């Protein structure tokens, strides 16, 4: 099967999928999301070329690769690169490259397992027939026919094979000899924000020599925890010209983003960044700053109590004064004239004393 016939088959499959509400050209987005999730879930070290230098002041450890789960808030937006000259979205590369990358992003481990277990298989239809779905079998067979079964199965026993390199070996993706790009500027806006803010990372670059399919890697370093967030954006290829690519990075309002400066590094790679088969086209670093307002301290109630006034007895204490007792003057007792009058006088005196 020649390449033009394979392109026709893929075009028919694409039309069929579009009719079934399945957009095969969304391979760029799907590949990027799947690849990012796969790398983060495996929590593997990202292997950048040794010539990439990180400023020692950032104290970054590449071995601590994590996708901050608050970055589920970081939607994996695939902002396509735009040509600064025409303003049109870049759509380079043959349909074979997009389909191949999307297909192998899902089925490369399966094909590696099939070929490892069954050994040399004499036909493309037998290798691909071990897949489960008709569409995948057709795409696999078409890719296999591009290079022939003898070359096809050997690709999947190559050490550290990845979808980009496999698609280049299959000839579905172009392999320019001297891809080159210059970075013009990298901006982050706003330059200063609070935790929970969204920051727009905007890269402007110039492609000097045509590139093949590759990736942008947007890396935000969390200096507090010595970890990082990585987002990959796939591109099919660029012809010479000026372009820009953007990525929205959303922070979270928690202890990850304390006050301080956060480095943002962008890599552009021909192929899959960090692998032995990729070419680093360029890199640059910028920063944004988190500046949260200082919380106003809440006044603490004092433990000292207001003294309670002691009530004073306003009623004066009566002063006891002795009432002088008059001593009755003894008067001569008249001589009773009769006994009855004497009794009456004695009784009256007794009563007066008892009162």
UniProtKB/Swiss-Prot annotation:
Tell me the InterPro entries matching this sequence. Answer: SaposinB_dom
Which keywords describe this protein according to UniProt? Disulfide bond, Glycoprotein, Secreted, Signal
Glycosylation sites recorded in the entry for this protein: 132, 209, 242, 253-254, 282, 303
Give compartment(s): Secreted
Signal peptide location: 1-27
Its family remark reads: Belongs to the countin family.
Q: Does the keyword Signal apply?
A: yes
Q: Does the keyword Glycoprotein apply?
A: yes
* An example Gene Ontology CC term for this record: extracellular region
Feature: compositional bias, Basic residues = 345-355
Specify the protein name. Answer: Countin-like protein
Give me the stretches of Low complexity compositional bias: 69-83, 301-342
Species this chain originates from: Dictyostelium discoideum (Social amoeba)
Its main localization is secreted
- What residue stretches are annotated with the Saposin B-type domain? 93-177
- Give me the ranges of the annotated region Disordered: 63-83, 290-355
